[in-house]
């Protein structure tokens, strides 16, 4: 319980959850775009970003786009066309089709499915890495055997159980689309995330491990797919002497100015990962003895990028907390706390945390969509079904978890104060 009598000095400047960290070369590449008048969606910066993405991640082709969401949209369109054929103009490539999706993620992972007319089916989370549960995925294929597309995200920079998921997806003849927006630079068995699907995406949003203020990349080893994405992203203009269009296109290309920032950031990716790892380790050490644990990782098979440090409170140490659609209330209890209380305490010293991603199956927009847990249909819950021990893992992690300030410019002294505030919540 965080007592009102606790007096912790507020930070003069806010400690952010995860803000951009600039180094200097970024502005030089932006100036280069300005001074050479390449203030468009073509130019050297874009070419360099695509080259650097391929070189670092280990894929054959990269297409720089305006956002990770744009990249994922075109990946879903490609997957839909491959699985079900080219749709008529005005119809989505996934129209009327189910797509298996990570449940505990940001809605940008899922919305592109709907852009193409698909119906997301949410697959529950596992406790080992907080990612898609392979057991639940197999159960989903039993329930919906005709599904041909699966989109998997790696939460907070920690790769999921890639081999298990891929084996199930391949067994059922489906296509994997990998959302590596949060996990750029993370590896699974020595291989970079963003290479495991047929179509893959990364993000350069302002809070990511490296940034362009915006932007993303579509990644693949399929040259035809890369060319198709490049064409679609420039309004699907044909190679004709006039403006001719035979397919639906989009204005999704990355700006050469934004690309200048990304180009300047790329050489610092490993440095950023090392800084994020140090933050995670300091939290892990500093919170020892409290009834909490950090976000889990499979360090035998993966090297996360430690994008965000998170904690989850032990069940017996949770005070009473009730969340509505937009409001929350809790009861202070000695020796116990909850995510809401900790976030309020952190905010009181001018630091930013946030709740864990609210699972997609709990979101109002998707509350009628199918949801699959290890034991089957997660929506069909009678009292007997619940008493049988069916677990909604994503809901549990959301209820007990939170993201801690993870800005790589945060000083050790600032982090120590945040740790002391968290400790005070359990007094």
PLM ranges: what are they?
Residues 1-39, 405:
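N-terminal "arm"/small-domain region of PLP-dependent enzymes with the aminotransferase-like
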């Amino acid at each position: 319980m965080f007592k009102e009598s606790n007096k912790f000095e507020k930070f003069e400047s806010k400690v952010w959850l995860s803000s951009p960290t600039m180094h200097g070369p970024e502005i030089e590449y932006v100036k280069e775009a300005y001074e050479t008048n390449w203030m468009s969606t073509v130019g050297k910066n874009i070419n360099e970003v695509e080259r650097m993405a391929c070189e670092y991640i280990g894929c054959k082709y990269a297409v720089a786009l305006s956002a990770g969401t744009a990249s994922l949209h075109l990946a879903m369109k490609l997957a839909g066309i491959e699985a079900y054929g080219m749709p008529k103009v005005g119809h989505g490539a996934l129209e009327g089709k189910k797509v298996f999706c990570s449940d505990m993620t940001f809605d940008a992972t899922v919305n592109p499915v709907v852009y193409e007319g698909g119906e997301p089916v949410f697959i529950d989370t596992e406790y080992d890495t907080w990612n898609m549960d392979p057991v639940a995925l197999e159960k989903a294929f039993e329930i919906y055997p005709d599904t041909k597309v699966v989109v998997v995200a790696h939460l907070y920079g920690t790769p999921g159980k890639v081999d298990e998921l891929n084996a199930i997806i391949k067994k059922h003849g489906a296509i994997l689309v990998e959302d590596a927006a949060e996990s750029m630079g993370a590896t699974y068995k020595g291989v970079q995330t963003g290479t495991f699907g047929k179509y893959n995406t990364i993000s350069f949003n302002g809070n990511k491990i490296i940034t362009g203020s915006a932007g993303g990349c579509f990644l693949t080893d399929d040259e035809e797919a890369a060319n198709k994405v490049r064409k679609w992203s420039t309004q699907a203009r044909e190679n004709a002497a006039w403006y001719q269009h035979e397919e639906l296109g989009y204005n999704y290309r990355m700006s050469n100015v934004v690309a200048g920032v990304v180009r300047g950031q790329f050489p610092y990716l490993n440095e950023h990962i090392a800084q994020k790892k140090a933050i995670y380790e300091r939290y892990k050490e500093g919170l020892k003895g409290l009834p909490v644990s950090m976000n889990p990782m499979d360090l035998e098979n993966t090297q996360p990028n430690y994008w965000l440090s998170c904690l989850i409170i032990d069940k017996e140490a949770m005070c009473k907390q009730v969340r509505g659609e937009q409001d929350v209330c809790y009861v202070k209890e000695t020796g116990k706390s909850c995510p809401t209380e900790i976030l309020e305490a952190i905010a009181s010293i001018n630091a930013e945390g946030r709740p864990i991603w609210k699972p997609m199956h709990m979101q109002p927009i998707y509350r009628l969509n199918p949801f699959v847990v290890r034991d089957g249909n997660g929506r069909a819950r009678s009292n007997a079904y619940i008493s049988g021990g069916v677990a909604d893992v994503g809901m549990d992690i959301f209820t007990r978890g939170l993201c801690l300030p993870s800005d790589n410019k945060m000083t050790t002294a600032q982090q120590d104060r945040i740790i002391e505030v968290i400790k005070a919540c359990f007094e």
